[in-house]
């Protein structure tokens, strides 16, 4: 008579262990015992009056072809509220959806798009923008450098930038140091898209003016990563080159853009940047964190930037706020790191960018 192992006495277990070492004496088999008990809902269904009438649940082409298959029979009602399996169709990454929308806004506002490489020279990233070669932002703790150098652009532009740094232009004194051409050749991952604006300004001719340009692309900084900072981010860039442009126009462009992006609360505060004067910081209200979120800077480019690149000083409105922070409020994201964490569930369920 088979015995259950759990019911054996200690001495029986000892005997079993000894006999298991001998072949053909003990046979152990494993069986699964399942106890089933009807639930309260099941009991209600059993006691209810369920019709045994045959009903058609699906209407198929085969059923419709034969009148005898459906005539005189009943069709089961469709329950429009019953749960169905979720279907996740293919779609663009939600950050890319927002980036495309940002491009659409600038285009509708009459701007032309600028593009540029993510790897650029220190000349275009810093020197052309009147950032001194001993400025802290150029140190390795802020910028990702590449262990290679590149050639410099047209000698005329290089000479003009060098003089701007060493002696100044239009009455300024510059930075009063010896500008190093070799330092300007260093390659780096661009920390901002303003280098694209610098290249664009240098390529313009008199007949191209007035003009409005924008860029929206990836930037990289050696930042301490937290909920509002990342080492990789999108930035939206803009320049307006117009002899009649003024500071009020600058604020107007920015207000219009961020309102179209869905922000009602926008404010500006005075700021300092090496290549603009006057300068402002742009802030929008983050409804989830209940704080004013700083997006970046804007201002009118200094003569030390415009004269070397354009040949003369013309008012150039310029801005370069971070774009990823703009998305946080719409997607109810509390941490910038959530934008790129490769969470499949998030990518499937997050809403489309619709404004």
Predicted region positions:
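TRNA-recognition modules of translation machinery and tRNA-sensing kinases, especially anticodon-binding
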Residues: 32-355
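Short amphipathic alpha-helical interaction segments
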Residues: 5-22, 27-28
């Amino acid at each position: 008579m088979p015995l259950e192992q759990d019911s054996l006495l200690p001495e029986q277990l000892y005997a079993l262990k000894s006999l298991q070492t001998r072949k053909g004496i003990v046979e152990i088999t494993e069986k699964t015992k399942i106890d089933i008990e009807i639930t309260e809902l099941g009991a209600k269904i059993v006691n209810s009056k369920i019709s045994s009438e045959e009903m058609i649940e699906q209407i198929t082409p085969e059923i419709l072809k034969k009148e005898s298959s459906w005539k005189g029979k009943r069709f089961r009602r469709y329950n429009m509220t019953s749960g169905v399996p979720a279907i996740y169709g293919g779609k663009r990454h939600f950050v890319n959806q927002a980036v495309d929308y940002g491009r659409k806004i600038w285009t509708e506002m009459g701007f032309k798009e600028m593009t540029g490489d993510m790897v650029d020279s220190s000349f275009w990233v810093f020197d052309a923008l009147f950032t001194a070669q001993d400025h802290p932002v150029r140190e390795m703790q802020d910028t990702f450098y590449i262990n290679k150098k590149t050639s410099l652009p047209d000698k005329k532009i290089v000479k003009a930038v060098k003089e701007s740094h060493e002696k100044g232009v239009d009455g300024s004194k510059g930075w009063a140091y010896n500008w190093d051409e070799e330092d300007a050749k260093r390659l780096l991952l661009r920390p901002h898209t303003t280098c694209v604006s610098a290249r664009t300004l240098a390529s313009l001719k008199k007949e191209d003016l007035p003009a409005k340009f924008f860029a929206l692309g990836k930037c990289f900084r050696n930042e301490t990563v937290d909920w509002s900072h990342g080492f990789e981010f999108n930035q939206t860039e803009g320049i307006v080159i117009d002899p009649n442009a003024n500071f009020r126009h600058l604020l107007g462009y920015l207000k219009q853009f961020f309102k179209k992006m869905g922000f009602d609360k926008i404010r500006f505060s005075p700021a300092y940047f090496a290549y603009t004067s006057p300068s402002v910081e742009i802030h929008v209200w983050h409804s989830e964190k209940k704080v004013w979120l700083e997006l970046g800077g804007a201002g009118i480019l200094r003569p030390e930037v415009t004269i070397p690149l354009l040949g003369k000083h013309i008012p150039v409105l310029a801005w370069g706020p971070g774009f990823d922070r703009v998305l946080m409020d719409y997607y109810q994201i509390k941490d910038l790191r959530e934008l790129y964490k490769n969470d499949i569930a998030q990518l499937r369920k997050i809403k489309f960018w619709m404004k």
